[in-house]
């Protein structure tokens, strides 16, 4: 017998941790998403997960993850509700709980067309749109002549400084995990100065490129090309529509649009940092 609306509204929300990884991946699969266990492990370790257990004992009924960057910003991602409980107000209730937990902290998230009305009703506004593109990199359009090399441990402090400048906030807990999380990590260098960096991390049968931080489009293109040379998988990344030259170049090189999402914020007029040099997020779930 289906659980009543009153009983559903009383189910407790609890914190999720690394031990809930498989349950989160199962919920992703239930909604037609990829399991993405590698990404889930990062998010549940570096962020704070919230979930509602299914009273029928079938794992999680709903979940979400918050990645905090201090009092200046937190990102909400992976908001999922099991198919059997869809359209019953569970997603809105979980989001309201997360909003209470985050208090006055400004928030950001990427929203699908289906999810955007829910978030607008909770006070989020759209500030940009981003295309997810995916495909085998063809090397049809050449990359600019920019020096790119594998990152080393000695680069870490310079990478953190550049990321803090461009992202606008300190995300050391995430960036310091990149060497272990990513299969490939590259830096662009000009005159001994690091001018950009990018990672390619494994996600099912693809390599996701992110973060992609660079002083200009040419540097971003060179970083992507270097990662593509190192990869034996299709590539996937999320690029804001403002970066028309980079998007056009990626499409010339065989990556096609999969979906367009809204970049949204709450309690802040825009994201901190420099959007012109912030080309791709580490993952849309972490902003």
Identify the role of each PLM range.
Residues 1-7, 17-18, 22, 42, ...:
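Intrinsically disordered, low-complexity, positively biased terminal segments
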Residues 10-104, 111:
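Active-site-proximal cofactor/substrate-binding loop regions of enzyme domains
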Residues 61-62, 128, 196, 259:
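A structural microfeature
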Residues 104-110, 125-139, 257-269:
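Conserved catalytic-core motifs of GNAT/GCN5-like acyltransferases
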Residues 119-124, 250:
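Conserved active-site tyrosine of GNAT-family acetyltransferases
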């Amino acid at each position: 017998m289906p659980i009543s609306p009153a009983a559903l509204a009383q189910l407790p929300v609890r914190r999720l941790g690394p031990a809930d990884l498989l349950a989160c991946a199962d919920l992703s699969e239930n909604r037609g998403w990829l399991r993405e266990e590698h990404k889930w492990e990062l998010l549940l370790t570096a962020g704070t997960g919230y979930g509602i257990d299914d009273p029928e004992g079938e794992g999680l009924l709903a979940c979400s993850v918050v990645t905090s960057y201090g009092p200046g910003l937190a990102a909400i991602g992976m908001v999922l509700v099991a198919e059997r409980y869809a359209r019953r107000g569970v997603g809105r209730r979980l989001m309201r709980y997360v909003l209470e937990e985050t208090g006055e902290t400004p928030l950001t998230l990427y929203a699908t067309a289906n999810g955007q009305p829910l978030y607008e009703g909770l006070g989020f506004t759209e500030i940009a749109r981003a295309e997810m593109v995916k495909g085998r990199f063809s090397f049809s359009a050449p990359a600019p002549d920019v020096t790119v090399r594998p990152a080393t441990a000695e680069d870490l402090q310079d990478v953190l400084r550049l990321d803090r400048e461009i992202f606008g906030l300190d995300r050391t807990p995430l960036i310091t995990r990149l060497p272990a999380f990513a299969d490939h990590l590259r830096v662009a260098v000009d005159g001994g100065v690091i001018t950009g960096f990018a990672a390619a991390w494994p996600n099912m049968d693809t390599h996701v490129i992110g973060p992609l931080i660079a002083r200009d489009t040419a540097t971003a293109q060179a970083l992507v090309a270097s990662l593509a040379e190192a990869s034996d998988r299709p590539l996937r990344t999320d690029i804001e529509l403002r970066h028309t030259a980079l998007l056009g170049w990626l499409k010339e090189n065989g990556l096609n649009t999969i979906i367009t999402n809204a970049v949204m914020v709450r309690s802040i007029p825009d994201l901190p940092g420099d959007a012109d040099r912030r080309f791709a997020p580490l993952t849309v779930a972490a902003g």
